[in-house]
Curated annotation (Swiss-Prot):
GO terms for molecular function: electron transfer activity; FMN binding. One of its GO terms (biological process) is electron transport chain. It is a single-pass membrane protein. Its cofactor is FMN. It comes from Sodalis glossinidius (strain morsitans). This is Ion-translocating oxidoreductase complex subunit G. Signal peptide: none annotated. Its EC number is 7.-.-.-. The modification FMN phosphoryl threonine is found at T175. The chain crosses the membrane at residues 9-29. It holds the Pfam family FMN_bind. PANTHER family: ION-TRANSLOCATING OXIDOREDUCTASE COMPLEX SUBUNIT G.
Length: 211
């Protein structure tokens, strides 16, 4: 009887060890798959605001944490530095429009260091369906009109909605939302124009002391 109990105990221990190992393996594979999918989705978004033919480095490996009032909040924002043969040529940077109609609007903006906007996309918002939500690419191409626009100075009067004498369309029944997004893109382009030399001194994404 004692021998039988020992055999059962050993068998159970072996099965438990195998089950634990299999669970760890599955979890590891699942985590790796999720991380790859997240990286792929992030690159797809980055490609929309910084054309891939402009750079030849790995954007996800050149991620810095930037904190500045021009980016709309006190929270650190991720900045991805694009290089061509080692020379910085542009950046994609998270930014916030704090003054949306229904709260903060989060964006990703791509621009070079001369004030030229390469692209912009809204990543999160709470604007009114049917009105302010036209900032989403899936509902309107309005957000694409920032591509190719240039910021000559902080006081560039063309950076306004058309009803205020500027070059950007407002939405029917909704001016606050497009104005907020436009001003956020403007501030972000201005930030990149002024801060090229400071970017590489910023902490890297993943630095535990800044998370």
């Amino acid at each position: 009887m004692l021998m039988t109990m020992r055999k059962h105990g050993i068998t159970l221990a072996v099965f438990a060890a195998l089950a634990t190992g299999l669970t760890a393996l599955v979890n590891g594979l699942t985590t790796s798959t999720i991380e790859r999918q997240a990286a792929r989705q992030q690159m797809q978004l980055l490609d929309q605001v910084v054309p891939p033919d402009l750079y030849n480095n790995q954007l996800l490996d050149e991620c810095y944490l930037v904190t500045d009032p021009a980016l709309g909040s006190d929270a650190p924002h991720r900045l991805y530095l694009a290089r061509k043969d080692g020379t910085p040529v542009a950046a994609a940077i998270e930014t916030t429009a704090p003054d949306g109609y229904a709260g903060a609007i989060d964006l990703l903006v791509g621009a070079d260091f001369s004030g030229n906007v390469l692209g912009a996309r809204v990543t999160s918002h709470h604007e009114t369906p049917g009105l302010g939500d036209k900032i989403e690419l899936r509902l309107s191409d309005w957000i694409t009109h920032f591509s190719g626009k240039s910021l000559r100075s902080d006081n560039d009067m063309s950076w306004a909605v058309k009803k205020e004498g500027g070059m950007f369309d407002q939405f029917t029944g909704a001016t606050i939302t497009p104005r907020a997004v436009m001003n956020a893109v403007k501030r972000t382009a201005g930030y990149l124009k002024k801060n090229l030399n400071a970017l590489e001194k910023m902490p890297h994404c993943g630095d535990s002391s800044h998370e």
